[in-house]
């Protein structure tokens, strides 16, 4: 699942690698993994950072995180609850706890935690801004919330990952509401094992949000996305 090629200028590469929120993102200089579960540690021979959104089974696998960190010496960025669970297995200098509003850097890549509307202890979503300014919004398995409109207006996202299933209350319609509020260049339906749900999301986007493109991802396939011009 490693991405061998280097992204072109003003682009990033990504892979969706499970039925949940597992996304591998590669910028020109950094490799970032979000919410890895249901994969082997050797799937990620290179990593600069792992981002954890919350402690639920489909987002946090403590043993997997520990093994990847030992193999790659990467930084772990996690919500407070997940960070507490990892504090005895991850070196203190490699574990960064974040709450909504916190921002950190992985090299020249910015990672900003934002609110998450999901029934977990202290969940977050992540805005990932590449060194070229490509903006990705990883929304964990959040349901829509009003503040997304202001976040979208401020950030001008190139891509937003939108949950369409396998989470309390999540449907193609709630995923569309995230896209409607954030108005990205590209909306990606994920956190589902149903291609029917993904297609339903795409149909709503086409009808209701014509300025946003929908990318239905295949698992373990590499996609390139570019900066909004």
Provide a role label for each language-model segment.
Residues 38-82, 154-161:
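Active-site metal-binding motif and surrounding structural segment of the metallo-beta-lactamase
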Residues 75-78, 93-100, 159-164, 188:
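Short hydrophobic/aromatic-enriched beta-strand-loop microsegments
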Residues 34-35, 51-52, 114, 162, ...:
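Redox-cofactor binding/interface segments in oxidoreductases and associated redox assembly factors
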Residues 40-42, 56-60, 83-86, 102-105, ...:
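Active-site environment of divalent metal-dependent phosphoester hydrolases
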Residues 12, 16, 90-106, 151, ...:
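Binuclear metal-ion centers of metallo-dependent hydrolases, dominated by the metallo-beta-lactamase
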Residues 128-185, 189-196:
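Metallo-beta-lactamase
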Residues 31-32, 49, 159, 186:
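Short, Asp-centered acidic motifs that coordinate Mg2+ and/or phosphate
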